[in-house]
């Protein structure tokens, strides 16, 4: 698991994405996309874009995943745990992207040793799962 180095810009974006920020709509989506891009630029640029898929965990992960996708120019797919059966992408590198990981149950069911996890917020109780 990787973490962005916190600075004023990162802290401001994270604050915008929290449920108590009062921010919604395009401004919230853009904050998630910027955080995704910044995480990708700091942690995933060494990955081969032709052999990498970012998976947006629906619905909360869509804009965060798009930020990663645009930064990496890799493959993209969406996964809705409520309606979809999980099929791991055939690429070597898979990044599971969700804006918030609460219990970790959704990702625990699809996570493997080759998978990377990207999230804006991970509940400390879920961290030991990964």
Language model regions located:
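PRPP-associated nucleotide enzymes
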Residues: 1-130
């Amino acid at each position: 698991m990787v973490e962005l180095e916190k600075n004023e810009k990162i802290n401001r974006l994270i604050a915008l994405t929290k449920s108590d920020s009062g921010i919604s709509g395009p401004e919230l989506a853009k904050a998630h996309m910027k955080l995704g891009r910044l995480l990708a630029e700091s942690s995933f640029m060494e990955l081969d874009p032709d052999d990498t898929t970012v998976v947006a965990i629906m619905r909360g992960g869509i804009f965060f995943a798009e930020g990663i996708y645009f930064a990496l120019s890799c493959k993209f797919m969406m996964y809705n745990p409520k309606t979809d059966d999980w099929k791991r992408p055939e690429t070597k590198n898979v990044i599971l992207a969700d804006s918030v990981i609460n219990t970790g149950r959704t990702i625990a069911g699809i996570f493997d040793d080759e998978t990377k996890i990207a999230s804006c917020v991970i509940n400390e109780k879920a961290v030991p799962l990964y």
